[in-house]
Structures are given as C-alpha cells and as structure tokens.
C-alpha cells in the first residue's frame, strides 16, 4: 500500500532523482517550457513551485536556498538569478499555481504519456 507516500520514485535512486529534478528545474527556468513525461512533470511542478514561493522574499538566505536546490554550478547560478529577479516578481500577487501541465502525446517506443510543463502567463 502506498498510503501517505509523498513523492514518486521515478525508477531512480535518491541521488539520481534529485539530479533529475535539478536539471529539469534549470531547463524549465531557462526556457520557460519543456516537454517531459507526466510523472516527471508532476514532481517537477512541486519542486519548482516551492522555489518560486520562497523566492518572493528576495534576501540573501533566499538566494542561498534556491542556489542549493538548483545545484552548485554556473548554470544553477544563472537559473537562481532568473528565478529571483524575473520569475518570482511576475507571480507576486499569485498565491500558487505558477505552472501548467498540458498533455500532448504518447511517446513512440515506450508509449509513455508526454506533456508540456510551462509557467502560467507565458
């Protein structure tokens, strides 16, 4: 039984799952929209929306928190800057629901359900 289980394992061990979410989050922040499978998109939505909610209060601790969640490299540094300076102010009056998931197709090869995840208002 999976009662009260809070996240999807996505067929990966914990470090691999965290790396996947960091990379997907950086891609989404850089591009505004990405195509991925539905379970990955649903996990990514939780991950990114927490970052945006935290980023609304733009102080040094917020910068450090977001940077730690996105990894510690130049790509994460640019994504952190974009979240805090561009994306979070755009959603300042919204209390949640910063992303939308649009189901698109079934992937040829393994028939995985694909979707586009994007920020609302783009």
Curated annotation (Swiss-Prot):
Chain segments annotated as coiled-coil in the UniProt record: none
Assembly, per entry: Part of the 50S ribosomal subunit. Contacts protein L32.
Cited Pfam families: Ribosomal_L17
GO cellular component terms, semicolon-separated: cytosolic large ribosomal subunit
GO biological process, one term: translation
Name of this protein: Large ribosomal subunit protein bL17
Record-linked InterPro entries: Ribosomal_bL17, Ribosomal_bL17_CS, Ribosomal_bL17_sf
Keywords: Ribonucleoprotein, Ribosomal protein
Residues passing through the membrane, by range: none
Keyword Signal in record: no
GO molecular function, one term: structural constituent of ribosome
Record-stated family: Belongs to the bacterial ribosomal protein bL17 family.
């Amino acid at each position: 039984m999976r009662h009260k289980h809070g996240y999807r394992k996505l067929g990966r061990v914990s470090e691999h799952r965290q790396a996947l979410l960091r990379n997907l989050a950086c891609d989404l922040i850089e591009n505004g929209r990405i195509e991925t499978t539905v379970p990955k998109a649903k996990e990514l939505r939780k991950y990114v929306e927490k970052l945006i909610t935290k980023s609304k209060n733009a102080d040094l601790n917020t910068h450090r928190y977001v940077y730690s969640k996105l990894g510690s490299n130049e790509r994460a540094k640019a994504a952190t800057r974009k979240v805090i300076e561009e994306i979070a102010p755009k959603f300042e009056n919204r209390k949640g629901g910063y992303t939308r998931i649009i189901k698109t197709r079934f992937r040829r090869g393994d028939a995985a359900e694909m979707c586009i995840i994007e920020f609302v208002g783009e």
